[in-house]
Each structure stands twice: as C-alpha cells, then as structure tokens.
Amino acid sequence: MAQNEEKTPKSQKIQDRIIMAMIWVVAALVIALVVGTALNYINIFK
C-alpha cells in the first residue's frame, strides 16, 4: 500500500489505462467465446 501512495498521478493514470485495456480485452474474449458457442449450437440444431 505504501508504494502506491508514493506514485505520481501520471503513473497512476497509466496504470488505470492498462487496467481498463485489460478489462476490454477480457470482455472481448468472453463475448467472442459466447458468440462462437451460440453459433456452434445454432449450426448443430439446424
């Protein structure tokens, strides 16, 4: 916790951007997985 307090606002902003980017990547992967699975089920039942 002490290390985080010493960080400058600039590095904190960069860290927040990295976290947001990771969240977007994970969300995109999850959506792609769900869509792919749904398409596979649709193709099976056609």
From Swiss-Prot:
<dbReference type="GO" id="GO:0016020">
    <property type="term" value="C:membrane"/>
</dbReference>
<keyword id="KW-0812">Transmembrane</keyword>
<keyword id="KW-0472">Membrane</keyword>
<protein>
    <recommendedName>
        <fullName>Uncharacterized protein YuzG</fullName>
    </recommendedName>
</protein>
<feature type="transmembrane region" description="Helical">
    <location>
        <begin position="20"/>
        <end position="42"/>
    </location>
</feature>
<keyword id="KW-1133">Transmembrane helix</keyword>
